Each structure stands twice: as structure tokens, then as C-alpha cells.
């Protein structure tokens, strides 16, 4: 891609998300969503492959439908209250339609079907942007609307998302699909606590972005897209194999790694709000995610395939642009569980 074009597209993606997050008027929120959507399409079609074109088309159709529902909800609220302010959405029907529209944009169940297909059809870097940065804008609007959202609707979607994210990833061998189902599950955890503690949703999102970014950067460095290609990592670079193991277990929420912290804090808040059954159910559903991540780490680090590699084992990383950002990301993704009491006090 031309450097000037790439700079313009990246700037538009960042600007669109920033407009959505900082806006207090529904019209500018809609403009920000549209800027972001139109700018991400060339990023998804970067490889000029039929699968990338198909993925970009699916993404466009889903996001356009969600934007249409968003404007429908805004119009209904405008007719009933005469307000354009984001914080003044009080009409129950408008709130329900808005919640469904934002759920489509986030990929929450039962609107999750596009997430694995689109992620599988795009390059790893595009998949990283799709599963991390693209979650910021819709989730920020959900946090703003959280005091008025119907608890039954949002909790139903969060429970379904955790279940679908766990069950869907069990029989997958494509790493991008596994990361997509992991994203669906994490979105379920974030929305489960949304109506009780929106700031904890933001903390969960930030940690999820850190862990997912670390995993994707490692996959980009090793050029791994399937479990078979990932299984050769130990023969080439054992250090990367060990880091992938710990990062994936952290994504699964295994203590004493970072990924256990948001789950711990969310379950604690749910039990404080007397949602014992919901917290127990979500803790059990989280085992599904942990299972397929454990299976991945077994394939990656606990088995060694026959190899004819006659070169010396490469303990060092390749000198790449992505490797420079790995050190802080790895530390954040795996080692900040001891900060949980501080995080609980702050969030």
C-alpha cells in the first residue's frame, strides 16, 4: 500500500473512533462510525484476495445495517423526547434498538456470525485491528448508555456470547478463528459487568487489547495461521514458543497470569450485586475458553514434531518493527496480577 494512502487511512480510522468517543451528539457519533467503517475497508482488502474481498463485503453489510438501526433508534428517541444528546436516550424502544445495533458492531451473540468469517478472510494485522481497535467506539457508547440499558437484554447477550465464544473455538484449527471466538467470549465478559460497573468494562477492554495485540504480533512474527504451523515454532525459536504459551494461557484466564485479573474482579462485582447464579455460570463457561487455549499451548510447546532443521536454534527474535513493542506488551499481558488490589481500588 502506498505510504501516503496508508497514512490517510490510518488517520481516518483513529479520527473516526475519536469522534465517536468524544461526541455528545448523535449525528457526530454516526459520522464517526461511518468514517471508521469506510476507512477500515481498504485495510481488510489489503491482500487483493477473493477471501479478503468477501470478508470486507460482509463487514460492510453488517456495519451498514448496524448504522441504519442506530439512526432508527436515534430518530425514535428524537420523536419521543426531542433530544439529540447521547446521554438523553430514554425511550425504551429506542434503547433496545440501539443496544442491538451496538451488539452487531461488537459481534455479540446472537449477532456474532460475521466475526469468525471476516477475521479468517483478512491478514493477521487487519485481524488485529478488527478485534481490538474496532471495539473501542461501540463499547464507549454502550458505557455511556449503561444506566438506561435493559439489564435482561444485555445480560442475555453476554451469557450467549460467553457460551458461543467457548463452544465455537473448541473444534477450530485456524488461529484467526480461534482469536475471533475468544473476542466474542471476552465481549460477553465485558458486557456482563457493564450495567453494574462500566469502569471495570473499560479495564477489561484495555487488558484484552494488550493480550490480543501480544498474541497477534507473535503470530505475525512466526507467520503462523494454523495450529500446524504454530507447532513448528518450538523447533525454530523456543523463546517465542514459551511466550506464546504464557500469553495464550493469560487470554484463557489462568492464574497467576494477567488474564485472571479482570475475570476475578468481574466475578467479585457480580457476587456483590447478588448475581451468584450468573457469576457461577460464567466461571464455568470460562473453562471452555481455557480448554482450547490449553490445547493450543500443548501443540505449541509440549510436543516436538520431527524436523530436518539443520540450523542452530534461534533464541533471539527477528529484528522487526513488531518486535520492538513486544517487551512492554508481554509484561502487561502476563505479569500484572499482583496489582489487582490497586486496580480494585482505582476501578
Swiss-Prot record:
UniProt membrane topology term: Multi-pass membrane protein
Chain ranges passing through the membrane: 13-33, 59-79, 84-104, 111-131, 149-169, 178-198, 201-221, 240-260, 276-296, 326-346
Record keywords: Electron transport, Membrane, Mitochondrion, Mitochondrion inner membrane, NAD, Respiratory chain, Translocase, Transmembrane, Transmembrane helix, Transport, Ubiquinone
Swiss-Prot/TrEMBL catalytic activity: a ubiquinone + NADH + 5 H(+)(in) = a ubiquinol + NAD(+) + 4 H(+)(out)
Xref: InterPro entries: Complex_I_Subunit_2 (IPR050175), NADH_DH_su2_C (IPR010933), NADH_UbQ_OxRdtase_chain2 (IPR003917), ND/Mrp_TM (IPR001750)
Enzyme class: translocase
A GO MF label: NADH dehydrogenase (ubiquinone) activity
Gene Ontology biological process terms in this record: mitochondrial electron transport, NADH to ubiquinone
Family designation: Belongs to the complex I subunit 2 family.
Protein name: NADH-ubiquinone oxidoreductase chain 2
Originating organism: Chrotopterus auritus (Peters's woolly false vampire bat)
Lineage: Eukaryota, Metazoa, Chordata, Craniata, Vertebrata
Amino acid at each position: 500500500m502506498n505510504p501516503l494512502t496508508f497514512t490517510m487511512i490510518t488517520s481516518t480510522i483513529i479520527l473516526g473512533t475519536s469522534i465517536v468517543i468524544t461526541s455528545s451528539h448523535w449525528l457526530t457519533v454516526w459520522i464517526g462510525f461511518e468514517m471508521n467503517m469506510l476507512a477500515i475497508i481498504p485495510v481488510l482488502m489489503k491482500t487483493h484476495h477473493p477471501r479478503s474481498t468477501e470478508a470486507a463485503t460482509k463487514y460492510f453489510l453488517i456495519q451498514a445495517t448496524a448504522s441504519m438501526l442506530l439512526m432508527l433508534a436515534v430518530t425514535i428517541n428524537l420523536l419521543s423526547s426531542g433530544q439529540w444528546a447521547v446521554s438523553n436516550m430514554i425511550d425504551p424502544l429506542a434503547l433496545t434498538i440501539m443496544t442491538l445495533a451496538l451488539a452487531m458492531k461488537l459481534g455479540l451473540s446472537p449477532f456474532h456470525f460475521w466475526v469468525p468469517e471476516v477475521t479468517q478472510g483478512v491478514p493477521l494485522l487487519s485481524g488485529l485491528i478488527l478485534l481490538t481497535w474496532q471495539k473501542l467506539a461501540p463499547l464507549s457508547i454502550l458505557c455511556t448508555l449503561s444506566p438506561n440499558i435493559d439489564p435482561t437484554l444485555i445480560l442475555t447477550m453476554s451469557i450467549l456470547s460467553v457460551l458461543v465464544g467457548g463452544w465455537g473455538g473448541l473444534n477450530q484449527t485456524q488461529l484467526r478463528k480461534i482469536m475471533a471466538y475468544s473476542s466474542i467470549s471476552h465481549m460477553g465478559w465485558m458486557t456482563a459487568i457493564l450495567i453494574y460497573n462500566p469502569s471495570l468494562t473499560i479495564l477489561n477492554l484495555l487488558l484484552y487489547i494488550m493480550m490480543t495485540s501480544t498474541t497477534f504480533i507473535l503470530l505475525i512474527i512466526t507467520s503462523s495461521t494454523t495450529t500446524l504451523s504454530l507447532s513448528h515454532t518450538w523447533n525454530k525459536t523456543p523463546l517465542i514458543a514459551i511466550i506464546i504459551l504464557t500469553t495464550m494461557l493469560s487470554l484463557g484466564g489462568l492464574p497467576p497470569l494477567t488474564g485472571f485479573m479482570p475475570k476475578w474482579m468481574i466475578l467479585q462485582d457480580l457476587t456483590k450485586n447478588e448475581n451468584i447464579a450468573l457469576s457461577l455460570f460464567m466461571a464455568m463457561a470460562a473453562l471452555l475458553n481455557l480448554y482450547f487455549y490449553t490445547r493450543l499451548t500443548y501443540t505449541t510447546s509440549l510436543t516436538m514434531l520431527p524436523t530436518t532443521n539443520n540450523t542452530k536454534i534461534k533464541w533471539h527474535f527477528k529484528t522487526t518493527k513488531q518486535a520492538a513493542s513486544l517487551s512492554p506488551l508481554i509484561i502487561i499481558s502476563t505479569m500484572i496480577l499482583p496489582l489487582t488490589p490497586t486496580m480494585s481500588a482505582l476501578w
